[in-house]
Each structure stands twice: as structure tokens, then as C-alpha cells.
């Protein structure tokens, strides 16, 4: 699976740009997540291990989003639309 940091979707002939904001992983009957901030900072969350806290993992370009702890695989990707200011 290829995970793009940005995707473009065409609606009625107009291109809309979306930026990756999160990846949900599943494996071993358990979900974990990575969250991506607007500045491309990546955080890891596992409610069982980290509780309410997140662990800093680095900048988006240096984190392998296709693989996660204990062999968990990506199950869902979340993107938000980038609104252009005029």
C-alpha cells in the first residue's frame, strides 16, 4: 500500500488538495494510530500502552507509515482538505 502525504480529488472539474492527518493500524485484535500535524510532525498513540499520551516519532518524511509496531497494518487513512486563502 502506498500512503501519499497529499492527494488531489477532482469534483466537478475542480481539483481539491487533501493532506494526510492520520493512519489507523490493526493487528492482534487491537487498533493503534499515528497522527500527523499540520507541520508534518508524526505522533503515535496506543491507548493500552500510552494511555492518554502520544509518543513523538519524527517528521512525516522520516516515518515509515506502511509499517507499525508488532506487524500491524494500515486499515484507514484520514485526510483533511487544504483550503487556499485568497
Tell me the role of every PLM-derived stretch.
Residues 13-86:
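Conserved catalytic-core surface of thiol
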Amino acid at each position: 500500500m502506498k500512503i501519499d502525504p497529499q492527494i488531489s480529488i477532482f469534483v466537478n472539474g475542480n481539483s481539491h488538495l487533501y493532506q494526510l492527518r492520520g493512519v489507523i493500524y490493526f493487528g492482534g485484535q487491537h487498533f493503534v494510530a499515528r497522527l500527523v500535524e499540520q507541520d508534518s510532525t508524526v505522533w503515535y498513540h496506543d491507548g493500552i500502552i500510552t494511555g492518554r499520551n502520544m509518543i513523538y516519532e519524527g517528521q512525516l518524511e522520516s516515518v515509515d507509515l506502511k509499517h507499525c509496531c508488532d506487524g500491524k497494518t494500515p486499515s484507514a487513512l484520514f485526510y483533511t482538505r487544504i483550503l487556499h486563502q485568497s
